A protein has these predicted regions:
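N-terminal Rossmann-like NAD(P)+-binding domain of SDR-like oxidoreductases, especially those catalyzing
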Residues: 1-112
């Protein structure tokens, strides 16, 4: 088993407003200090956006409990090259966890 320290790292988590992504953001904020977590999500409407907004509010509340943790959210699509370049240029993440997905089955049928 490989052990990697996340302390003092900048972690980019894509799909951070989704179920798995938001759970990972919360877990990192609760267990690693100091740390910087950059979340990015397109906030698409493949399912109810209010659920994603609620998750982001929960993350903000949790981040507020950890003064040595930095959390930033970016509304953006990782399919957009310029967005990704800006994120990497501005935050220079040490670790990237790609949990972004196109969750909408109907959309994927009409736009394969």
């Amino acid at each position: 088993m490989v052990s990697i320290s996340l302390k003092n790292k900048t972690i980019l988590i894509t799909g951070s407003a989704g179920f798995i992504g938001s759970s990972l953001v919360l877990a990192v904020l609760r267990t690693v200090s100091p740390v910087t977590v950059i979340g990015i999500d397109s906030m698409n409407d493949y399912y109810d956006v209010s659920i994603k907004e609620w998750r982001l509010k929960e993350i903000e509340k949790e981040a507020g409990k950890h003064p040595e943790a930095v959390y930033r959210f970016i509304r953006g699509n990782i399919a957009d090259r310029e967005t990704v370049q800006v994120v990497f240029s501005e935050y220079a993440p040490d670790i990237v966890v790609n949990l972004a997905a196109q969750a909408g089955v109907r959309y994927s049928i009409t736009n394969p």
